[in-house]
């Protein structure tokens, strides 16, 4: 970024708040030796943060550690370390970055060593790799492990039997393990209070995501959206901090709508909205800003994305319900995006295309992420057929810098935007 653009960098109150929250959680994690707090490692989809807080345990999420290392340009060497130790090139790079991080002293972003987990909680919501990842972690740390088995929505619906099965596991396996490891007795009223906070924050998050229906969209629901979902999908859902963060964020977006502004980018306000896109798949983290710049330089705004639903489909009506504490945790896990079948995913993308008046669909296929990438070409063709809008396919990776080609992605995006322009011209001639 040039010196001329530096003064335009915008730091809003919500950004500062989120940065403080993340830094505070890492300080809490790396300070558990002094505080005596217990640590549980879990994953983002199906993350039961409200339940974890009931036992005064600190939540550590290995994916977010890999993302942090990716954005700090540190994951490449960690991945190569893991491959030298025998992990295949095809294995999820989150896993390899985590394994490599452990081999390098398991240093957190604050420069201090991460603690060993006292417990592993695997909420299985459709990603088979998570199971193998936790087998590696269990072998490394030899700590108590509990798996919450979440039935797959093969038929595209959640049944009473599925819900009852998850609640039964929570009562008979998960909660007793938490009590045993933490030494804290489960208090369902405490859980209810956290769930109330969650529902309030979820309302504001959904409002923010749906603000992209405006023209111009005041947000980028993919590149900006990954920041907006951060507190909700990680160690903060259910906290007063999350409620405050989403309240601040909503207020800022309301102001942008009043002023007719587009999204904030790393180089200031986006000046012109030329293309409205729906994006399927996670972003590339190692070249995140470079990747984003390829979009906003062309006036392309992502108005809806599937990745920002990986930790919960709140915009489809789900809210945590304090009146049914364990049942609502089951519903949450069952409804995560990666636990939906392909027809459900296609229907969601089609809905986004229509509701957000998108010009087209873009799929960012991740080389090492099978839970997202499987079936994406099929999904792309189906969306083209249903909507008549152009779709495109690019390939990158999560946190492996070897699989981000700036020139290749740039060429594909430029060709795609030309295709969108041609489609618009054809539509204009047809109606003339």
Swiss-Prot record:
Co-factor(s): iron-sulfur cluster; an oxidized flavin
Gene Ontology terms describing biological process: catabolic process
Reaction catalysed by this enzyme: cyclohexa-1,5-diene-1-carbonyl-CoA + oxidized 2[4Fe-4S]-[ferredoxin] + 2 ADP + 2 phosphate = reduced 2[4Fe-4S]-[ferredoxin] + benzoyl-CoA + 2 ATP + 2 H2O; 3-hydroxybenzoyl-CoA + AH2 + 2 ATP + 2 H2O = 3-hydroxycyclohexa-1,5-diene-1-carbonyl-CoA + A + 2 ADP + 2 phosphate + 2 H(+)
A molecular-function term among this protein's GO annotations: iron-sulfur cluster binding
Reported function: Catalyzes the anaerobic reduction of benzoyl-CoA and 3-hydroxybenzoyl-CoA to form cyclohexa-1,5-diene-1-carbonyl-CoA and 3-hydroxycyclohexa-1,5-diene-1-carbonyl-CoA, respectively. The enzyme also reduces other benzoyl-CoA analogs with small substituents at the aromatic ring.
Known partners and oligomeric status: Heterotetramer composed of A, B, C, and D subunits.
Family that this chain belongs to: Belongs to the FldB/FldC dehydratase alpha/beta subunit family.
Name used for this protein in its record: Benzoyl-CoA reductase subunit B
Organism: Thauera aromatica
